[in-house]
Structure formats: C-alpha cells, structure tokens
Design a protein with these regions (language model features):
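Alpha-helical scaffold within the catalytic cores of cyclic-nucleotide enzymes
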Residues: 43-57, 74-117, 142-153
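Helical mechanochemical/support elements of P-loop NTPase systems and associated helical scaffolds
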Residues: 38, 45, 64, 83, ...
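A structural signal for short, well-ordered beta-strand segments
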Residues: 18, 68, 115-121, 192
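Short acidic-rich active-site patches of cyclic nucleotide enzymes
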Residues: 24, 59-60, 64-76, 122-123
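Cytosolic regulatory/linker segments at or just downstream of nucleotide-handling modules
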Residues: 124, 147, 153-199
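Juxtacatalytic helix/coil linker segments
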Residues: 1-60, 64, 109-111
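Catalytic strand-loop-helix junctions within cyclic-nucleotide turnover domains
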Residues: 71-82, 117-137, 154-157
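Short, conserved catalytic or interaction motifs in soluble domains
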Residues: 28-31, 35, 58, 74, ...
Length: 199
C-alpha cells in the first residue's frame, strides 16, 4: 500500500478491519504512579499488543496516549474473512499475553493491567495527513469513527474484546452476541459481539 510514498495528501481508499485498544483506568494509574513508572507500564503493554498484531499480519499505525490504532487490510480477492479472523486471533493472543506477563500494577500494589479491544470492518482512507513539516500516517473515515464509538462500550459491557456486527456477519469465527447497543453518532442500534472467552 502506497509503496513507501510519504508526501502529504497521498492516500488510498482500502477495505480493512480496524483495531482500537486502550488501557482501562489509565487516568487513575497516571495519578498513582510517577511518569517514569507509567512509561514503563505503557512500553510493556504496547510491546505485547504490537507483537500480537504483527504476528497476524496487522499494521500498527499510531499510539494515542494509552491507545493503539491498527488495521488488518482486506485482500479484495479473499474477502474480509481472513482479515477478520486474523484480528480476532491477535485480540485473543494480546489478552492472553497481558494476563500471563508482568503485572506492573500488581507489583506496585495495585490491580493487574487491564485493557479493551474494539474491532470493526469497513472502508477507510489510508495515507498521510498533517502540516508540510510534520506528517502523520493514519487511517480516517466512518469505520474508524464507529470503532471508537464501540470503544466506549468496553467499560459499559465489561468485556475485554468487542466486535461489530459487520465483522460478525463476515466471519466464521464463534462469537457471542451482547445484544443491540446504541452508539453515539450512529442512527440505529448495532448488535455487538464478543469472543466466547469473554462472554
């Protein structure tokens, strides 16, 4: 994609599974721990998440505070199923590694690291945006916005992985419905799913 072009305005419209994940209780953790400790927690967390995404063929685009934005591009010849399956597998691995890894908060006397993952499938614009001397490589579009809306439900539904109806309709993976949920800015309620491991 884009073959390494880095000029502002260069972009490509692609179909992709969008991944957004973020730490829970990040604000409280930032108040409890000194900045160097928080940096260590974030780096350890990001290393595990990025490794899980990359192992399944995903591409991490950016870190936004405690959040990760990534995509699993859809091959037009294969359809969305392989990308959806890869994103779901990465989500499961990331949560397993977080549970088995060092518990930075536990070692400091608090709870273990907890984070949520949200997955949605749609069309995105993939490319460079920003000022002439400061470019940001990212994806934008309604699919990204809806993934962010689903992110807010992780705390409400108390599930670590949430999957959109669009992905559920295009995958053969086993998923569990959490019912129809209202998403801010989306006209109709959307059915949301999770993996059986988090039902």
């Amino acid at each position: 994609m884009l073959q390494g072009q880095i000029y502002r305005g260069v972009n490509e419209t692609i179909e992709s599974v969008v991944w957004i994940s973020d730490l829970r209780r990040f604000t409280r953790m930032s108040d409890e721990f000194a900045p160097p400790v928080m940096l260590g927690i974030l780096n350890d967390h990001f290393e595990r998440v990025v490794g899980a995404i990359a192992a399944q063929g995903g591409e991490v685009l950016k870190f936004m505070g405690d959040s990760v934005l990534a995509i699993f591009p859809v091959d037009p010849e294969l359809g969305a199923r392989p990308a959806s399956r890869a994103a779901l597998a990465a989500g499961l691995v990331a949560t397993e590694q977080a549970a088995a890894g060092p518990r930075a908060r536990g070692e400091a006397g608090g709870d273990e690291i907890d984070f949520g993952i949200e997955l949605h499938h749609g069309t995105v614009v993939y490319g460079n945006i920003g000022a002439p001397d400061r470019l940001d490589f990212t994806v934008i579009g309604p699919a990204v916005n809806q993934t962010a809306r689903i992110e807010a439900l992780c705390r409400t539904l108390d599930r670590q992985v949430l999957v959109s109806q669009r992905i559920a309709e295009g995958t053969d993976a086993e998923l569990v419905s959490l019912g129809c949920q209202a998403l801010r800015g989306v006209r109709e309620p959307q059915e949301i799913f999770t993996l059986p491991e988090f039902a």
